[in-house]
Amino acid sequence: MMLELRKIGVLPRDEDLDYPVDEVRGLFDAHGLDVSFLEADAAPADLDLVVALGGDGTVLRAFDRFPGCPVLAINFGTVGFLTAGDRKDLAQIVQLLVDGRYVVSERLVLLCRYPGGEDLVYNEVTLRARHKLLFTDVFVDDAKIRTIRGDGVVVGTPTGSTGLLMSMGA
């Protein structure tokens, strides 16, 4: 799938950190692409692409703030499992993007419904009970698959299960 790249938003991990703003803007401007830097509390905009400058936390924040919008992640953070490359690769990544030499990876998400609301889940959802037995009904596509009895349940996406296993040292 080729993206139409008219409006690109850049979402930095932390506005107070030293980002090469001029370099990033220059790389996109050199190819005639309209790029704007997004503030942390800015309302979601109509964008064709979000470029997340940070680690996996920034990527997840971009998914949450701009649902359905493709996210290109450049690792400026600590954990870069979901990123296309590191800060040093920025010029090459922009060139590959402009040349159309990329693959869009679709990520599976979960819809978690709970009393009082629902949320999209990109990694995993954890339900825990302290000091008591928990009975949890698990549904897939509105069909109950089982009731789980225990002190907790973790349900993860393929992306989230990898992160969860890595955090456990596996």
Language-model features and meaning:
Residues 1-49, 53, 65, 87-103, ...:
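ATP/NTP phosphate-donor binding region
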Residues 57-62, 161-167:
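Short glycine/serine/threonine-rich phosphate/pyrophosphate-binding segments
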Residues 79-152:
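Catalytic core of DAGKc-family lipid kinases
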